Amino acid sequence: MILVLGGVTALGLCCTSVSFAADAPNGVVLNEACAKNTAFAAADGAYYDWIELYNPTGQAVDLSGYGLTDDPVKPGQYVFPTGTILEAGGRLLVFCDAKAVAPAGQLMAPFGLSKDGETLLLTDPTGKQVDTIAFGAIGENVSYGRVPDGSDQFAYLNMSPDQPNQTEDVLKTAVDAPIFSKKPGFYDAGFDLTLSAPAGTTIYYTLDGSDPTTDSQKYTGPIAISDVSSSQNVLSARTDIAATDFMSQVTAPTSPVDKGMILRAIAVDANGASSSVAVGAYFIGYQNRASFYRDCKVISLVTDSANLFDYEKGIYVLGKTYDDWRNGPDYDYSTRTWEMPANYMQSGALWERPASMQIFENGSLVLSQDVGIRIHGGATRSQNQKSFNVYARSNYGAAKVEYDLFSGKVQSQFNGGVIDSFDSFMLRNAGNDSQYTRFRDKLNQSLVSDRDLLTQGMEPCIVFVDGEFWGHYEITEKLSDSLVKDHYGIKKKDVCIIKNEELDEGTEEGFVEFTALYEWVKTADLSDDANYKKLCAQVDIQSFMDYMSAEFYYNNTDWGQNNMAMWKSMQVKENNPYADGKWRFILFDTEYSTNLYGQTKPSDNSFAGLLKQDCFLSKLFSAALQNDTFRRDFCLTFMDMANENFKPERVTARIEALSRQYQDMTLATYNRFWPGWPGGQYAQSQYNSETQQVRSFYQSRFDSITSALAGTLSLQGRLVSLTVRNDESCGTIQVNSLTPDLSGGDWIGKYYTDVPVTLTAAPKAGYQFAYWNIGDQQKLTDASCQLELTGDVTVQAVYTQSLLGDVDLDGDVDVADLVQLQRYLLRQGTLTPEQAVQADLTGDQRLDAADLMRLRRMLMQ
C-alpha cells in the first residue's frame, strides 16, 4: 500500500508540515523516523538514528521475517528476528547504524538514515511491500511521522520516540520553495533567471537534474538561462541501456541532441529544514527547429540520473541484474536480448522511481507534477528507447493527473464525458513498430474505436529526460481498473481484468470465474442452443465478435495467448448496462501486424493462425463456431467491419494523415536511438517504404481475409454488393451492427449470400418511414427487416412527411385515428413507436387524455 507523504515531492523533500490525505492504513505501519538524533539515547548511551513501527490494528502482529530497508533495491537489509511480536496498539523502535552492535534488548538495523532524506520500506516475509514512507531533509531532533499515530496524515515533528505523535508536536513552520522569476517553458532567447525565497533561508540548486542538497551549488545571483543543445551529451551518450547481439546494437548519437536547461532548487532554513524542490525546464531557441515541438505536447521528466542509470538501482540500464546473470549458472549464450535478465526487465513497486513531470503545449507550461515512473512493456523493454509508466500518487503530491492528456478526444462510453483525470498513463515507445512507422497501433485501434470493445486513447508527444531529447512517445491510456472505471462507470473495486490468461486486476473470485469459463468451453457443445445461451450470459458476444474481427483483420501474430485482455464487473448494477457481469474485451499492443517486418502479410489466414494456438481465445472461438447463430452473427459483424471500419479509402486517408504527422518525429527518434545502424542515417525513403507497407496491407487485405472467413465458417455462397441509399435529412439507417457513412453518397458493402442482412430505418421528427425500395423490384414496409441477398442489389429507405394525428399511418387524420388512440389509452390496443410519435399531439413525449382531447378538437375543426 502506498501511503500519503507530507508534501513529499518526487525527490523526497518536504514543503509542508502536514501531508495530503490517503487511504487509512490497515496493518503495521512505519510511524515515525529520525535521521539526526542527539537527544534520545539508546541503552548503551549512544545516539542513533531510529525508526518507529506502530500497530494500529486490534490484534498482535508477528513480525518474524519481516524486512526493513532504506534502499528499495535491497529489500530486507534488516530482518526482524523470530519471535518479534508487535502488540495491538503497540510501538516498536528500531535503531539504525551501519556499524554499531544492537544494545542489549533493543533492535539495530545495519544502515543509517541520511539527514538529506530517505525512502524506507517495510516488507513481509515473502518480500511483498507492507508500507513505505519517504521524507526530505530533516533538522536535528526533528522526526517525520504520522499525526496521530497510524493515521494517513504526516508531518515534521519534535521527535517523540516510543511515545504518541500528537498535534502539539507538529512543527508549525514550513519552508516555502524557491520562486523562479520566469515560468518554465520555451523561449526564443536566453535570459537571466532570478530565484527568491523567504528571508532567513539559503537556496541551493543543480543544473544536471540531480537532487539538490546543502552540498549543491549555493545561489548567490541570477542564473543565465541559455540554449544548451550544443553541450556534450550525457545521458544520451550511455550505451549500457540494452544488450547486443547479431540483430541489435547500441550506438550513441554522434552529434549533440536537442536539450533544455533543467534547474532544481531548494530553500533551507537555519534549523536545516528544507523546502520542496522547485523544478524548471527551459528550452531556448526552438522557434526555428522541428515543427513537432510546436504541434505536439512536450513532456519533461526530471529525476536524479541514478534513478535511471545507477548500476544497482537504475531502471533504464542492464545493471547488476544483467551481470549477475552473465556470471551465474543460468547464463546461456543463445538467449535473445529480450529474454536476458537486466535491471530494465524488473517490475513492481520496488522498481518505481520518483520524477518531476512538466507538460508544455505551444511552448507554455500547462502542468507541473511529481510522479512515479517505471519501465513498461514486455520484450520491448530491451530496446534502446524504453516505454514508461507514469503514476500519480498521494505520496508524490497529487493522487491524479488532472489534465486532458488527449485533447478532448477520449470520452466515456458510460456518460459521454471527456476523460481528463488519470491515476496513471503510459509513455509508449511504439512497441514492435518503434523502428518503422511508429503509428501502427494507433492506426489500428482508431479504426475500430466506434465498436463494442475498449480501445486506448493515444496522442503523440515529445519527451525530454533530464533535459535531453528522448524522442517521440505515444501518451497512452494504461490498461488498468482505472481505465475500465473511466470508460464504463464501474467502481475500481468491482473490476476484474484478465490479461494474457492471468489475473491482472481484481479479486481471486474473478479469476476463478474466468478459469471455470475456460475449462467449460474446452468441452462444451455449443451447437446446443441452451449451451450457447449459457455462453451469452457470461460473455458479451458482440464485444467478442468485434474484438476477434479486428485482430483477425490486422493479422496480429503477437496475439492469442499474448496481448489479450478482457474485463467484467463483479457487481451487477441495473442502472449501468456495462455492469451486467459479462466479459468484454480490450484492444492493446496491436502493432505486430499489417505487414510488420514483412512477416504479417495481407494474404495470411489469421483464422487458421489463431486456431493452431492452445489458448483461451482459440478455444472460445472454436467452440462458438459450432453454433449456427454465432456463425451467422459473426459473418455479418466481420463483413460490417470489413466494409466500413477497414474500407480501403477510409484507411488510406487515415494513413496519409498519420504519415505526415509522424514522419519528422520518427526520423528524429530513430536517429536519436539507432544512429548509423543499419546502414547510416534513417532516411525519408525508408520511412516512406515502411508507410507503404501498411498502406498496401489494407489495400489488399479484403479479398484474402474474406475468403478465409468463408472457409472458416463453411460458407457456400458468394460475395455480392449491397448499395444503400438514404436521405439523411429524413432519417438514419443501420445495416446489421453498423451505421454506414453516407456522407459521400451511396454506401457500398459486400456480403455473402449465405446470410441475410438486417436493415433498420429510424425516421427523424416530422417524417415517417414508408418502405424499403429493393432494386426497384420490391417494397418492404417494415422499418426493420431482413433481406435475402441473391445478387448485387441497391436498397433505398423511403420516407414521407408525417401528419401529426395520423395514428394509423394511413395518410389521413380521421375518426379511425381517434378510435385507435382511445383504445390504446384504455389499454385495449398497442401502438408502434412510429404511431406513438404521431399520437403525441401535445409534444410532451407521453400519451394521455390531453392528446386525445387535442385530436378530437382537430377533427371537430
Q: Which sequence ranges carry the predicted segments?
A:
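Second-shell loop/turn segments in exported
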Residues: F40-A41, L427-Y436, K534-L535, L620-S622, ...
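Conserved ATP-binding subdomain of kinase catalytic cores across diverse folds
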Residues: L301, N327-V512
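Short, solvent-exposed loop/turn and secondary-structure capping segments
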Residues: A42-D44, S64, V79, A104-L107, ...
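Bacterial N-terminal signal peptides
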Residues: I2-C14
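Activation on beta-sandwich/Ig-like modules and their edge loops
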Residues: F20-F154, D215
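Cellulosome-associated attachment modules in secreted, modular CAZymes
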Residues: L11-G12, T16-S17, A21, Q796-Q861
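Middle-to-C-terminal accessory/interaction subdomains
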Residues: P161-V170, D295-Y322, R326-R336, Y344-S347, ...
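Short, compositionally stereotyped local motifs that mark structural "simplifiers"
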Residues: G6-G7, A21, V29, A33, ...
